[in-house]
């Protein structure tokens, strides 16, 4: 949810230069973090006319809303739950062109990330390829302490890692993110603009490929 809000804020903040519109879909029925955040912030704001749109759509209803989303937004960001158990999550993943997998560079997190990617590659990515869809997947080291040996080992051996890593990583800044995380453009603090730049480049390359 943090990364979704950061990238949505970046796209919206640079919209005058790029002309891109962004819509955020929160399909996490249980936590609904971004959806709840926007509802709360809406009570603190006179108008949301200048804000990007946040939509609470259950994963079981995502596909039937695809036409509306494609017609109204250049970039659609989907905030997923942390597991595949929720109804419709796998089907929604089938619709995703660019998948970013954030993970902490710890042994347990890396193990879970590889297990998820193996499932995704065999059961979702393979089916997308059969149907003629291009898919771009990147791993994003998250909550990184650069001097930790686990992160250094990950970077040093990234050619052996099954998921291609993004060039950027998100540093450990839980307190800063918790204090400043927002869905309102007036609160966007440009803390991860480099991540936003790389994401736009990644999406652009995916479209051109």
For every predicted segment, state its role.
Residues 1-2:
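Walker A/P-loop
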Residues 5-84, 181:
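P-loop/Walker-type NTP enzyme "switch/lid" segment
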Residues 25, 78-79, 101-104, 138-142:
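Conserved beta-strand segments of the P-loop GTPase G domain that flank and frequently precede/overlap
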Residues 87-107:
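Inter-motif core of Ras-like GTPase G domains
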Residues 113-133, 142:
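Conserved C-terminal guanine-recognition region of P-loop GTPase G domains, centered on the G4
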Residues 143-185:
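Beta-strand-loop-alpha "switch" segments that mediate conformational coupling across diverse proteins
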Residues 177-199:
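C-terminal boundary of histidine-terminating zinc-finger modules
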């Amino acid at each position: 949810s943090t990364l979704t809000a950061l990238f949505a804020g970046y796209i919206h903040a640079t919209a005058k230069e790029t002309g891109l519109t962004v819509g955020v879909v929160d399909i996490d029925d249980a936590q609904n973090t971004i959806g709840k955040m926007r509802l709360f912030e809406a009570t603190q704001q006179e108008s949301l006319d200048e804000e990007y749109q946040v939509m609470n759509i259950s994963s079981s209803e995502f596909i039937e809303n695809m036409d509306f989303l494609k017609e109204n937004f250049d970039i659609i960001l989907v905030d997923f739950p942390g597991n595949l158990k929720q109804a419709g999550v796998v089907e929604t993943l089938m619709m995703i062109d660019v998948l970013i997998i954030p993970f902490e560079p710890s042994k347990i997190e890396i193990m879970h990330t590889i297990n998820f990617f193996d499932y995704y590659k065999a059961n979702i990515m393979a089916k997308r390829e059969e149907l003629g869809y291009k898919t771009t997947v990147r791993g994003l080291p998250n909550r990184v302490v650069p001097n930790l040996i686990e992160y250094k080992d990950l970077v040093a051996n990234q050619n052996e890692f099954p998921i291609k890593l993004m060039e950027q990583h998100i540093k450990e800044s839980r307190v800063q993110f918790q204090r400043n995380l927002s869905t309102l453009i007036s609160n966007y603090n440009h803390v991860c603009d480099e991540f936003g730049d790389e994401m736009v480049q990644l999406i652009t390359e995916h479209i051109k490929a």
